[in-house]
């Protein structure tokens, strides 16, 4: 799915062996247990890129509660560009995707399907990097 495409794109940008992937549970209690189990890993790496701002913000909260300072000890970035990303402390660096364009594109695709027109099954939308305090050292 989309998350796998993001991970593969990230890997291709950094090269083989430079990116470790952590599959994170959706349930918060299970996610927090995974974070606790992996705390040594968080102390070893220099940065984390989460597949969504939600997971990045959740991780930053966990890190702070466990004595790991963002960004001094670990840089954190997310994906979505949600309004919350600019309100947390430190403000989250994020890859923003225009949600209006995403909705417009989805509606166009649905109309094409309703009208039995051929349509692409995969659409790649432009993104913008919004650099904030969570990745500044």
Predicted segments with their positions:
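A short glycine-/small-residue-rich loop at the edge of a beta-strand within enzyme catalytic domains
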Residues: 1, 22, 26, 47-50
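Short beta-strand elements in bilobed, periplasmic/extracellular small-molecule ligand-binding domains
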Residues: 7-32
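Conserved donor sugar-nucleotide recognition element shared by glycan-biosynthetic enzymes
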Residues: 2-6, 31, 99
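Flexible loop/turn connectors
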Residues: 18-19, 33-137
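Secondary-structure junction motif
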Residues: 1-12, 49, 56-57
């Amino acid at each position: 799915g989309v998350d796998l495409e993001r991970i593969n794109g990230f890997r291709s940008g950094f090269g083989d062996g430079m990116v470790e992937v952590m599959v994170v549970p959706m349930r918060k209690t299970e996610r927090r247990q995974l974070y606790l189990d992996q705390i040594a890993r968080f102390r070893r790496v220099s940065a984390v890129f989460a597949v969504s701002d939600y997971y990045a913000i959740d991780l930053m909260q966990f890190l702070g509660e466990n004595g790991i300072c963002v960004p001094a000890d670990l840089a954190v970035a997310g994906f979505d560009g949600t309004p919350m990303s600019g309100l947390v402390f430190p403000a989250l660096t994020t890859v923003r995707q225009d949600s209006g364009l995403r909705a417009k594109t989805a509606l166009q695709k649905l109309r094409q399907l309703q009208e039995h027109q051929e349509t692409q099954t995969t659409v790649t939308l432009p993104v913008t990097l919004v650099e904030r305090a969570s990745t500044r050292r």
